[in-house]
Amino acid sequence: IRQRLFLGELPRESVLETEHGFLVTSPLLTAFIMSRHLTDLQLLFVLAEMCGLFAVCALPVALEAELSRAIDSGAISTTFGWVRCPSEDGITSSLWRRDALVLGRDLDRFCSDVCGMRYGNRFMAVSQLVPLGAASPFEVEAYLLLGLPRALGGEGFCGIELNVEVTLSTSARAIVGKSHVYIDLLLSSPDGRRQVAIECQGKASHGRAGDGLRDADRMTALQAMGYDVLLLTHRQISDEDRFRAIVKAVCRMLDAEYRDKSSDEQRAEALLR
């Protein structure tokens, strides 16, 4: 245990009581304390996970066994809202689904409380870049590569929305058998007249392997609703040339001009992968 001295008034709701008789720091205060040891990019990923609908948690073998015993014996009835995502290779997954630990308004309030503190302005600046409600690490990576300013390695697409609910028309419902679907990432042109839906593929790692919709069905249903749809894979964002082709396709769909990156911007992009 390392002791930390926090001078001044603590941010609101930054210390939480537990039923076990001890106090814990809130997720945001924990991230703030950690931030002095993290790069801006590392802090951004930490906050994105806290504000997302997923967690990456690889349990040690002993703890995994203890958790199974506790559930089987009835000592705990559930994993308290955490659901492990299936993996394609049958190995126990370290990716979990859960509700967001931090909402956008929580992040805004915390930033207003730490503004002016040491590391506070940096924390606030990084928080402005955090995607809210991402469903997987893949969505976070795709969002950052597409949405961050070009100086930080992204493509500078503005106003990207995550997990947008789309209510389907009668004809689109007939394709998927559902009344609505979710778009992983929705990009819009500055005038709002053109939109591109990006579907993140690789559902086991993406976090929605059991959503009951085949990729082709969802893509066809969204196209029936008038959306341009692109499928995005890990392989595509990992390969610079493949990803560049995707970006150029998005620019064409949004009627936006593509501009080659400078050497500094390319180096910043490499850090995001």
Protein language model features and the residues they cover:
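Short gly/ser-rich loop at a beta-strand->alpha-helix junction or flexible surface loop bordering the NTP-binding
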Residues: I1-Y119, L271-R273
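Surface segments flanking catalytic/ligand-binding clefts of nucleic-acid enzymes
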Residues: A70-I76, F80-R273
